């Protein structure tokens, strides 16, 4: 018996392990497909084997990096491990910053010194927007205070030598592999797989190589406002120009001129079979020549132009214009990702891209609210007629006849179960269309399986990803490089804040001591109910109520965020405020949001995690967070974005928006809060710690007596373990609502006896006399 029991236990364990592995696979971000092809250079790291390390772990770079004589006038130094440090107070800061944003990933950008890191993907992005290997190495040498280490030079050459030399171009609805390097084309054609992909004529012979000369000019014309050099908050002192080494200044001017000039380029191309495109892309990646996707929309005569233009009132800000110039730099549309802070006008960038391409456009958001907002943005900024915009959500399915711009959600397109007849017809129409541009809003949220499904369902010539936070806790964000394209542009948050393009936010972490009764239970309980105890901490409730009262007296508009629905309802109902969460209908949501925007009596609303992204509330200037999703950096930044929109009529020098994160002291929440702040601290924000709110004792606040606090504690303890869990949003990516989850709990909880009380009732025996019953039926009486 013992052997059989052991075998059963082992079988159960292996089944459990297999199940957990499956769960982990589901959580994987883009790129968990084993067939995903990635160039081997993408996995390369900078070699720093020759670096000396002392007994304290400090690295000694003196022998590898001798200082230049005029090092004080040069703004950066490059470490042998690929990290680049930039002096933000240098006279040539603006030139160096523009260059570094193009070639490296920002790591941390506080006030005085910025840190960047060279990666294979950042160098791919640099090549994709037109920078040559020689440009990158030469300008890096000129900007550096020291000699650039040989390992860095080799790394740059390795990552840029082949990338960007071959392009997949769609012209007249035919696919061509194109390059300005004839030797590369000949090298590719020697490969048997690529020869198979090449189009052949009716006699079975390969079509001829096409040699042509074309003039490349940006599709986005530079405005007078945007032409004054790089956009920056730093104003260079004209007298400081003498401090700038001439070789630096001349070289930057030359690079700027090269970008502006119309260039004549001679290219060699061959036509390929459309059905072999995916095979061709994979093979080119294995040969270390990844294909850059470009769309020659001006010469696409097969897909009709749509009647859309920007309104004269739509004025692009310098950073928006710059991001679009990276996308349309050579007169064609490049696929890629643009990173702008929340509230910095990502929607206008998307609408302008659609107006530039002027082909059928598909926009994908992550909620029905974002669909409505994208429709409003198209109507606000462009001349498109309302009848040409078609929405496809669970609530609104517009007829697609004559539609030029379709707006939907990822979950609607990736839906695999049975659809209604009407939805099936719309899906068929979406699949048969050839889309010129696909705009992917909040592109960081998309897991691999769903993302691949969306990409295979609809055919689009150009893909533009928009996001504010290109971070994921699983570090799989880099796979977007080959699913969509490289990062084309990333803005500096502090720079936009200093220029008044986004609000100036005061970030604060408010420490709320746990009441003794709550803390005693918190220490004793080991289940998920601990989350409920530190969220429902009466001192946190009082701090929240005090901040709401304080800001309502200033006529501020306040959003309170809570991931936990039990806490959200308790707070909102007790404070008599409207709240929005998953089950709230679309009509009720829009009504609450409209009241919040326009009704002076509704100054505070409570929102669950459904409002993390795509809720456009420019009036809000105070955000209070009472519970959150663990240590998610992305969620913290997205929530801050709800109050980042520039405020009208406010002085830019003063703080005009406030972000409070309420944290229960001596609990797990403290550690989570520190983790969550990392992304914003790297962007240059600082968090002020408040241990005591001045004037809180004078206010008449809830839970001021021990009896009230005890009643609240009993209510929390009576709640189920399910109440302690975060909200699962229907249709949310990465949500595992359909899967089983493992929870700790008591036996009574598992038997459904959480709120059940055993009670006895003594009923009186004296009953009313029953009616006369026939003797025959008495036998069947129970």
Curated annotation (Swiss-Prot):
The modification Phosphoserine is found at residues 686, 751. SMART domains: DEXDc (SM00487), HELICc (SM00490). It is found in: Nucleus. InterPro entries: ATP-dep_DNA_Helicase, ERCC3_RAD25_C, Helicase/UvrB_N, Helicase_ATP-bd, Helicase_C-like, P-loop_NTPase, XPB/Ssl2, XPB/Ssl2_N. Phosphorylation on Ser-751 by CK2 controls the 5'-excision activity of ERCC1-XPF endonuclease; phosphorylated protein inhibits the excision activity and thus NER. Dephosphorylation reactivates the 5'-excision step. Phosphorylation has no effect on transcription or the 3'-5' helicase activity. It catalyses: Couples ATP hydrolysis with the unwinding of duplex DNA by translocating in the 3'-5' direction; ATP + H2O = ADP + phosphate + H(+). Residues 21-30 have a biased composition (Acidic residues). Residues 542-702 form the Helicase C-terminal domain. It holds the Pfam family ERCC3_RAD25_C. ATP binds at residues 340-347. GO terms for biological process: apoptotic process; DNA repair; DNA topological change; embryonic organ development; hair cell differentiation; nucleotide-excision repair; protein localization; regulation of mitotic cell cycle phase transition. It is an enzyme of class 5 (isomerase). Phosphorylation on Ser-751 by CK2 controls the 5'-excision activity of ERCC1-XPF endonuclease; phosphorylated protein inhibits the excision activity and thus NER. ATPase activity is stimulated by TFIIH subunit p52 (GTF2H4). DNA translocase activity by this subunit in TFIIH is stimulated by XPA, ERCC5/XPG and XFP plus ERCC1. GO terms for molecular function: 3'-5' DNA helicase activity; ATP binding; ATP hydrolysis activity; DNA binding. GO terms for cellular component: nucleotide-excision repair factor 3 complex; transcription factor TFIIH core complex; transcription factor TFIIH holo complex; transcription preinitiation complex. Component of the 7-subunit TFIIH core complex composed of XPB/ERCC3, XPD/ERCC2, GTF2H1, GTF2H2, GTF2H3, GTF2H4 and GTF2H5, which is active in NER. The core complex associates with the 3-subunit CDK-activating kinase (CAK) module composed of CCNH/cyclin H, CDK7 and MNAT1 to form the 10-subunit holoenzyme (holo-TFIIH) active in transcription. Interacts with PUF60. Interacts with ATF7IP. Interacts with KAT2A; leading to KAT2A recruitment to promoters and acetylation of histones. ATP-dependent 3'-5' DNA helicase/translocase; binds dsDNA rather than ssDNA, unzipping it in a translocase rather than classical helicase activity. Component of the general transcription and DNA repair factor IIH (TFIIH) core complex. When complexed to CDK-activating kinase (CAK), involved in RNA transcription by RNA polymerase II. The ATPase activity of XPB/ERCC3, but not its helicase activity, is required for DNA opening; it may wrap around the damaged DNA wedging it open, causing localized melting and twisting that allows XPD/ERCC2 helicase to anchor. Belongs to the helicase family. RAD25/XPB subfamily. This is General transcription and DNA repair factor IIH helicase/translocase subunit XPB. It comes from Macaca fascicularis. The gene is ERCC3.
